């Protein structure tokens, strides 16, 4: 979890899965990434999969005009937290996955490929994240480890609440998607479970769209 503000929420979530593993993690701090790895090593000894679902950009970088909200600090923060953190975590966790048919997964969004109003710098970060997936797949492939991404349609989450006019984005998708609706967290989760499983053993370096056909 990121900080004390999220502790109760994450603890409750862990209990739903009968887990007592709740680890503080600021992905901008390499020491905390290493500490997370050591906790998991002590607890499990090995790892079959990992899901990266982390993204952040300062508010001024995800509203209004792209250039007006642009700054070196905001740009760097978005890339660090939303993109670099995935390969950084995979590198730290790799010793726990070597010798196993493991799989790593991240979450992205269409704003990496198309201009989405107010998504701005986060779209650039997601593009970097998707490129990282392809390079990870090439690096991990000889070890039998797969790397993929899920590009989900917009879902009401804590992170999404920071995007200006997010509700308009939801309604836009509902009106144009072939299924005439948004997707659910369960639908994204089901796809993640598939990609992490042996049923997806031939899939790596890919970006799977779960967006009601949008």
Predicted regions and their residues:
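Short, small/polar-rich loop/turn modules that mediate ligand/substrate recognition or access, typified
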Residues: 141, 146, 203-205
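Short, flexible catalytic-loop segment of classical short-chain dehydrogenase/reductase
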Residues: 147, 151-162
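Catalytic Tyr-x(3-8)-Lys segment
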Residues: 167-187
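C-terminal substrate-recognition "lid" of short-chain dehydrogenase/reductases
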Residues: 45, 181-210
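Catalytic loop of short-chain dehydrogenase/reductase
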Residues: 55-94, 98-142, 154-156, 175, ...
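Short-chain dehydrogenase/reductase
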Residues: 1-73, 77, 90, 97, 133-134, 162, ...
């Amino acid at each position: 979890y990121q900080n004390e503000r999220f502790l109760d929420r994450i603890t409750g979530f862990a209990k739903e899965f009968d887990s007592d593993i709740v680890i503080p993690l600021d992905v901008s701090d390499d020491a905390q990434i290493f500490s997370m790895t050591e906790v998991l090593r002590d607890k499990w000894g090995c790892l079959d999969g990992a899901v990266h679902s982390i993204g952040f950009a300062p508010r001024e970088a995800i509203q209004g005009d792209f250039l007006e909200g642009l700054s070196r600090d905001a740009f760097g923060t978005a890339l660090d937290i939303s993109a670099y953190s995935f390969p950084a975590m995979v590198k730290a966790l790799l010793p726990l996955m070597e010798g196993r048919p493991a799989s790593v997964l991240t979450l992205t969004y269409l704003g990496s490929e198309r201009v989405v109003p107010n998504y701005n710098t986060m779209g650039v970060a997601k593009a970097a994240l998707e490129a990282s997936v392809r390079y990870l797949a090439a690096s991990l492939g000889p070890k039998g480890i797969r790397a993929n991404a899920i590009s989900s349609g917009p879902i009401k989450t804590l992170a999404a609440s920071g995007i200006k006019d997010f509700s308009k984005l939801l309604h836009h998708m509902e009106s144009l998607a072939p299924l005439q609706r948004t997707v659910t967290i369960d639908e994204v989760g089901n796809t993640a479970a598939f990609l992490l499983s042996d049923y997806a053993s031939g899939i790596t370096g890919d970006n799977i769209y779960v967006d009601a056909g949008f």
